[in-house]
């Protein structure tokens, strides 16, 4: 039975977005393996507190995530 564990910065995704991710991940397994696998796909989401996630030794905060998201959206037009 597939187990997908997702860790993300708390506040980076709304509850609706988290639910959509869970549904889409489950649907991906169904597309590959067939409908019979649906009830056996386990997806967990763990929120990591802002500032307790680091890349290259630099803590990542929700404010930085929002800044990056805004910059990406601005670049897309």
Task: Annotate the PLM regions.
Residues 2-77:
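A domain-level signal for the structural core that forms small-molecule/cofactor-binding pockets
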């Amino acid at each position: 039975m597939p187990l997908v564990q997702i860790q993300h910065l708390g506040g980076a995704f709304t509850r609706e977005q988290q639910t959509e991710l869970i549904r889409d991940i489950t649907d991906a397994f169904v597309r590959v393996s067939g409908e019979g696998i649906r009830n056996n796909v386990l997806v967990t989401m763990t929120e990591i507190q802002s500032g307790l996630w680091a890349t290259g030794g630099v803590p990542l905060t929700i404010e930085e995530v929002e800044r990056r998201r805004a910059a990406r959206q601005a670049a897309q037009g």
